[in-house]
Regions:
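Solvent-exposed alpha-helices and their adjacent loops that cap or buttress functional pockets
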Residues: 29-34, 75-79, 131-134, 170-173, ...
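Flexible glycine-/small-residue-rich
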Residues: 43, 143-145, 182-184, 192
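Residue-level signature of catalytic and energy-coupling elements of molecular machines
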Residues: 51, 103, 180
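A structural signal for small-residue-enriched, beta-sheet-centric alpha/beta enzyme cores
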Residues: 135-140, 183-189
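Translation machinery proteins
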Residues: 1-47, 70-71
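Flexible, glycine/charged-enriched surface loops at secondary-structure junctions
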Residues: 1-4, 167-177
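Long, charge-patterned amphipathic alpha-helical coiled-coil/hairpin "stalk" segments used as oligomerization
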Residues: 61-167
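Glycine-rich phosphate-binding loops that contact phosphosugars or nucleotide phosphates
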Residues: 52-57
Length: 194
């Protein structure tokens, strides 16, 4: 078990009841996540072959309805995977049957156009972390693992920090506190200079 490193933000003076003020960002980490990412794709035919060659887990579109009927199995799949992709024709079916499970987790599939290689999309997602505040003043995200060097972790943490600051109306003035911690370790408070 390799511990992840997380950065936690507590923000202030932001009205999160207004959805426009909520933070929902995908941040590309310059030094990668430090671990492999599990990506599944709803695909059939040639697209499924391409996705399988890229190392993605394939979910047959004919099983979407069955997954929707078995909520426990759908939850297990949603928790196991980091990201989902889907061929465009299957997006409606996925939304109808699995939206109730994938939506709240922020894991609705990204559509893959017919002319795009799913491996390229998966490669982009492998270095991505999601920062999501929902309606809470405190939120956190993983930005690396203990196996990475201090320089890599610093670059990743700065990428997340800059994206969050960029989304806040008053930048660092809206940050009450910021902590960095390992999965199992104590939190270390960062000094926020306004």
């Amino acid at each position: 078990f390799t511990e992840s490193l997380e950065i936690a933000f507590t923000i202030k003076d932001v009205d999160l009841k207004n959805p426009a003020n909520r933070i929902q960002e995908e941040v590309r980490l310059p030094a990668g996540r430090g671990r492999s990412v599990k990506i599944a794709m709803f695909a059939g035919g040639e697209m499924a072959t391409k996705a399988q060659a890229a190392g993605l887990e394939i979910i047959d579109p004919t099983t979407i309805e069955d997954l929707g009927g078995n909520r426990q199995k759908a939850r297990k799949l949603a928790n196991k995977m980091d990201f989902f992709l889907s061929e465009i024709p299957h997006m409606g079916t996925v939304g109808r049957y699995l939206g109730i499970v994938l939506g709240p987790r922020g894991k609705m599939p990204r559509p893959v156009p017919p002319n795009l290689d799913p491996g390229m999309m998966a490669a982009g997602l492998s270095d991505t972390t999601i920062v999501r505040s929902r309606d809470r003043m405190t939120f956190h995200t993983a930005f690396g693992t203990k196996d990475q060097t201090l320089e890599e972790l610093t670059r990743n943490a700065l990428a997340v920090w800059n994206r969050v600051i960029g989304k806040l109306e008053r930048g660092s003035m809206n940050i009450r506190s910021c902590y960095i911690k390992t999965s199992m370790g104590p939190a270390v408070k960062l000094e926020v200079v306004s």
